[in-house]
Amino acid sequence: KYGPATGKTVDVLVIANCVALENRIFLEHVLYNNSSLLVQLGLDLDEMAARMAGTPPAGWPRDKRVWQNLRQAASPAGPLSVISPVVGFDLDRFVRANLDGLWNQADYALLDSAYADNFTFEGPTDRKFSGAADYRSLLESMRTAFPDLSLQVDEVYWMGNDVDGYLTSERWSATGTHAGDGLYGPASGREVQIWGITQHRVHNERITAEWMLFNELDLMMQIAAAR
């Protein structure tokens, strides 16, 4: 799949969002940082995306039914912050508003108001940094590539308390048109599907750490297929 063995050691971030009932997982979404894996193996991402799009795996690209099923929530039917609002710090509302503001509204002031000064970030394809500047650059490059990008939050889960802090997991999906040059090469006009999982560490109502993956290699394959 990835060519001859290289003997290289790789370090690949994996994020899983599991839903369990009575100590049994009945729904699991997993994202592997496959684009980072390819880079660590010394492979060219654009070449690999084009090759894989030319000989795609079974079930690719996703049809509308599969995509809509992916975007559905397991339970509850609506956000808890709407169904059962709380007094004080509402973590469900906080993380939903953060994702909507950053990705849909381009409200980059949230990087100062919702995040700690030196928050850490680990994301797709070896993106690791601290602080707001690099994160804003990533968001702006995505907005340039997909000017009409529209993200919806599919599910939110969390654990913790106001004293010790919280850990959150947000599963999300987005659609957009590759109408801008830049991050993924010249505009292709391709309508794309993006899905991701973002996890946060939250303390004193500020995000202190974020781990985020989305289907970047798959996204590059979608664009390559349109060329």
Cite the ranges covered by each PLM segment.
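C-terminal and inter-domain tail/linker signature
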Residues: K1-R227
